[in-house]
Amino acid sequence: MERKYVIGLDYGTLSGRAIIADCKDGTVLASAVKEYDHGVMSEYLPDGTELTGTGWALQNPKDYIDVLKYIIPEAVAQSGVSSKDIIGIGLDFTSCTMLPVDENNVPLCLLVKNVSRPHAWVKLWKHHGAQKLSLIHI
């Protein structure tokens, strides 16, 4: 019987990781890691918009795709297994990572009209930059 393998993906606070594991005994054959190009955005958005106040912990969803395009091929190459023998993928994100999307599942921050709007970007678990409500109108 041919051996089968799975890919494990972990998106952390500063980087993404992939492993290739043997389905039969869980042995990890290879792993790959790549840091996010934008890291955690706590002072500025990619377009230079300053994040005023404190508690910002934002990420760029493009980083998740860039990481994915690197770590999977790298881990598969290191493992020496054939991609046809990989039968599943498991995915994990850090705690409660919030990604606002539109009705077509496009991240709001990737729409031109929202690039300078901090609340359109991915919110990390440690984000505390919510705007305080000063007036309530009923």
Each language-model region and where it sits:
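N-terminal glycine/serine-rich phosphate-binding loop of ATP-dependent small-molecule kinases
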Residues: 1-111, 136
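Glycine-rich phosphate-binding loop plus the immediately following alpha-helix
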Residues: 119-135
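A mobile, often basic/glycine-rich helix-loop segment
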Residues: 109-123
